[in-house]
Amino acid sequence: MIDRKLIFDPGKNQVIQTESGERYYFSLDERGGDGAVWDARSDDDDVDVTVDHTYPPTEASVRIRVHRGFDGPSTVYFVRKKPGSSEIVRKFTMSFFKRTGNVAVWE
């Protein structure tokens, strides 16, 4: 069974303990009048991230899927940029660790 979780505080750097097959869903606010939108990328093939936008930009829906066989750690990088610009308006990361009996710490 897939464990679906909602990340309650998106927009801040977070450390998450996870297992293979887990999925995470949350929304990011894109209101603000500047037209800036969120984008995300993962540094690991074992973690997929998808960002869907509403039009006009008011909200980004984020889905993260941890593949079977995930052994961590992995980080997803989020950046909010204005269209056609390299200027970063806001950014944060989500670091994923394989869940074990021990607490994982990101240094």
Protein language model regions, located:
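Short, solvent-exposed loop/linker segments at beta-strand-coil boundaries, enriched for Pro/Gly
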Residues: 32-54
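Beta-strand-rich extracellular modules
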Residues: 79-83
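C-terminal edge beta-strand
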Residues: 86-106
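Aromatic sugar-binding surface patches on proteins
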Residues: 56-63
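Short beta-strand/loop motifs in extracellular/secreted proteins, especially
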Residues: 24, 34-38, 74
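Glycine-centered tight-turn and secondary-structure capping sites
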Residues: 67-76
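N-terminal edge beta-strand
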Residues: 1-26, 31, 101-107
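Outer-membrane beta-barrel proteins
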Residues: 14-16, 52, 66
